[in-house]
Amino acid sequence: MNIVLVTATRKEIEPLLQYLTERIYLRKHQKVDIVTTGVGMMNTAYCLAKQFAQYRPTLAIQAGIAGTFHPIFAPGMVVSVKEDMIGDLGVMQNDQWLDLCDLGLAEPNTPPWKDKKLMNP
């Protein structure tokens, strides 16, 4: 099994890296690649496209803060994202946020969108 562990910055996963380093010998039939993408969607998309094209992982895991800071998510907490709203694609106009759908640049229910959200299948 080839696993890709994805993070924007290595600092986000330092405790996990220490854990894996100490125990990697237990994973003889599994390969774990660490991919540090840099912050932001464009960096992540570029790095993952390059990684996936070359190595074809069996499983990819996003680790780190995943672009969010919220007091209900304690450091080290594991979450599964069911849906996502992209806060980087849009504009502020008259003190109001307008997303791609509001601007007429995307349809709210045309894949990959559902009710203006990206759904995790």
Each PLM stretch: what is its role?
Residues M1-Y55:
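N-terminal short beta-loop-beta anion/metal-coordinating cradle
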